[in-house]
């Protein structure tokens, strides 16, 4: 697990739970300080986590260590090698999100939801990726 050497303390996560397929936005700091992760996992299993960073931003070592702690504590699968973490400003594929759901992986990181495509290949953006997740879950 190699965190990017940049500074951004506003890392957000989307937590999808098997129980209600609900999407919740938190920061790693919020989860750590307010113990919200324990509350979320008390009644439903966390399946995977999506990090959202803005264009040109990246996770901090603090956020990375926090995520690693959550993965270890709740025995979630590590990031699958054939998914790989996206670099800041790139776009995650819906197939990667589906793979993560199936294998209960964490650590799929996507770019700014306000940008429709990467401008080059027209790959789907963050919002569309999440739409695929909702569709995949029968919603």
Curated annotation (Swiss-Prot):
One of its GO terms (cellular component) is extracellular region. Its EC number is 3.1.1.4. This is Orientotoxin-2. Expressed by the venom gland. Has a highly toxic phospholipase A2 activity. One of its GO terms (molecular function) is phospholipase A2 activity. The keyword Secreted applies. It comes from Vespa orientalis (Oriental hornet). Keywords: Hydrolase, Lipid degradation, Lipid metabolism, Secreted, Toxin. Signal peptide: none annotated. Disulfide bonds: none annotated. GO terms for biological process: lipid catabolic process. It catalyses: a 1,2-diacyl-sn-glycero-3-phosphocholine + H2O = a 1-acyl-sn-glycero-3-phosphocholine + a fatty acid + H(+). It is found in: Secreted. The keyword Ribosomal protein does not apply.
